[in-house]
């Protein structure tokens, strides 16, 4: 397992090199990341069958949609709770949403969906957050934390600063975090560890 911890900027640079210089498409990296999260969920939460994926509109949310589809195909009960303005969705997110539509995976915008979940997947922000969480995002994060289900964070718990581990106003308190390619500097701080729970570094992502 890779021991090196890197910053958000370093991770973005590695992603961009892989996509632009090597030529591995972003959607391929997204699929590999999502497969790693799926595998972790099937290993650590094999009985989960009322899974709610909380997905933002960026590529972390796109990961979440791909994870929802992979869990659905694996026979798990899964629904998607969307947050944010879909008009601002990344192109990869839009592609994943189209695929989820094909599989008829339930999609909702009402956080009441969290009440009956037996597992929650946090795919709101990932490594990208650089300002305090506010508004509807803060509300949903608080509702995730108030739910009785365990939480798996995708890459970094939403609301945690990737570089420092600081809580950006409010943050998801995860039981398990699957982070991609390398650990992140914020996740090895005391506060980052407290919010990330157990950290799995999925280091076979094809990112160079």
Swiss-Prot record:
Residues reported in the UniProt entry to bind (6S)-NADPHX: 59-63, 126-132, 137, 155
Protein EC: 5.1.99.6
Cofactor comment text: Binds 1 potassium ion per subunit.
Ranges where the YjeF N-terminal domain occurs: 11-208
Catalyzed chemical reaction(s): (6R)-NADHX = (6S)-NADHX; (6R)-NADPHX = (6S)-NADPHX
Gene Ontology terms, MF aspect: metal ion binding; NAD(P)HX epimerase activity; nucleotide binding
Keyword Metal-binding listed: yes
The keyword Isomerase is annotated on this UniProt entry: yes
One Pfam assignment: YjeF_N
Coiled-coil regions listed: none
InterPro entries registered for this protein in UniProt: YjeF_N_dom, YjeF_N_dom_sf, YJEFN_prot_NAXE-like
Cofactor(s) in the UniProt record: K(+)
Keyword annotations of the record: Isomerase, Metal-binding, NAD, NADP, Nucleotide-binding, Potassium
Chain residues that bind K(+): 60, 122, 158
Primary role: Catalyzes the epimerization of the S- and R-forms of NAD(P)HX, a damaged form of NAD(P)H that is a result of enzymatic or heat-dependent hydration. This is a prerequisite for the S-specific NAD(P)H-hydrate dehydratase to allow the repair of both epimers of NAD(P)HX.
NCBIfam families: yjeF_nterm
Protein family per UniProt: Belongs to the NnrE/AIBP family.
Protein's name in the database: NAD(P)H-hydrate epimerase
UniProt source species: Limosilactobacillus fermentum (strain NBRC 3956 / LMG 18251)
The gene coding this protein: nnrE
